[in-house]
Amino acid sequence: QWERHWTVNVMAGVRLSRAYLPAMADRGWGRAIFISSESAFNIPAEMIHYGVSKTADVALARGLAKRMAGTGVTVNSVLPGPTLSAGMAAMLKPVQEKTGKPIETVAADFVTKHRPSSIIRRASTVEEVANMVVYIASPLASATTGGALRVDGGVVDSLA
């Protein structure tokens, strides 16, 4: 799984950046957005390979942001925490069927058990993560670059 995660989570970003950043720089405007994970800073013991690849993803974005300095191109990472996506809903479906609880409640129970540092004590919604992406893709975020922007519900216990 190490090689697969490295290829998907890191090398895909390298390849896409090589393909698109030069043209963005030539135009004097662009946005590169990496979807990372709170696992980049909160590496799960059961998924070290995933956490390491997401940490590399954040480092890649930061380095590319420095490389793009002065071009009008920003590069950022978005770090979702537990998110009630279709994938999470599918993973939790057996529990939902067994308990009869709404999927949001099952997801909140999962977050409470597996990510007890969560401040919001529930899974984020896909829309909440998308809102961050929309913002950093917009002209409003022209001074936001090289960032690791968390949409993690406070899961990562850090002041930075």
Describe the function of each predicted region.
Residues 69, 74, 144-146:
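Short, small/polar-rich loop/turn modules that mediate ligand/substrate recognition or access, typified
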Residues 43-51, 63:
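Active-site loop-to-helix junction immediately N-terminal to the catalytic Tyr of the SDR YXXXK motif
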Residues 37:
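Residue(s) in the substrate-gating loop at a strand-loop-helix junction
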Residues 22, 66-67, 142:
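Alpha-helical segment proximal to the catalytic Tyr-Lys
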Residues 1-14, 33, 57, 120:
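Catalytic Tyr-X3-Lys loop
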Residues 117-129:
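A conserved structural motif in NAD(P)-dependent oxidoreductases
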Residues 42, 133-134, 140, 145-160:
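Short C-terminal tail/terminal secondary-structure segment
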Residues 17, 53, 61:
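Active-site helix of classical SDR
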